[in-house]
Amino acid sequence: MAKFKIRPATASDCSDILRLIKELAKYEYMEDQVMLTEKDLLEDGFGEHPFYHCLIAEVPKEHWTPEGHSIVGFAMYYFTYDPWIGKLLYLEDFFVMSDYRGFGIGSEILKNLSQVAMKCRCSSMHFLVAEWNEPSINFYKRRAASDLSSEEGWRLFKIDKEYLLKMAAEE
């Protein structure tokens, strides 16, 4: 399959974006963790101040999924800032449906993300990969990605909403 196109997502793509987010979560054995709704995606990504940006991979009708979907991959990203190195593109989610892997779709999405990062003068692109996800780790390593966990010893932490609320209310 040589025909596909990568394009910025539009508000009308939110149902497909949510579908792919759920497919990625299932692939990562975390499908019960997805709490977002289509409305959240619409408001958060396509309002006056978008919190994220998204590229999607779309195939022509002759290559649609058996369920009739034309959108077969996506990359959700946003910009952040590192006080040591400046602007970063943070790749939050990146997924291509399994039947559409091996056709260059993921590589083309990553190329488009790289172009966005360079256009915005970002110093690098950061992302997380599950330790068990060897196919993705190898995909990124083939493209010169560095594993900061092993190379620099960084650890990722989070503070859940309930504790944020407690801290915010402290006097």
UniProtKB/Swiss-Prot annotation:
Keywords: Acyltransferase, Cytoplasm, Transferase. The active site is at Y140 (proton donor). InterPro entries: Acyl_CoA_acyltransferase, Diverse_Substrate_AcTransf, GNAT_dom. GO terms for biological process: polyamine biosynthetic process; putrescine catabolic process; spermidine acetylation. Pathway: Amine and polyamine degradation; putrescine degradation; N-acetylputrescine from putrescine: step 1/1. Residues 4-171 form the N-acetyltransferase domain. Its main location: cytoplasm. Its EC number is 2.3.1.57. It catalyses: an alkane-alpha,omega-diamine + acetyl-CoA = an N-acetylalkane-alpha,omega-diamine + CoA + H(+); spermidine + acetyl-CoA = N(1)-acetylspermidine + CoA + H(+); spermine + acetyl-CoA = N(1)-acetylspermine + CoA + H(+). This is Diamine acetyltransferase 1. It comes from Mesocricetus auratus (Golden hamster).
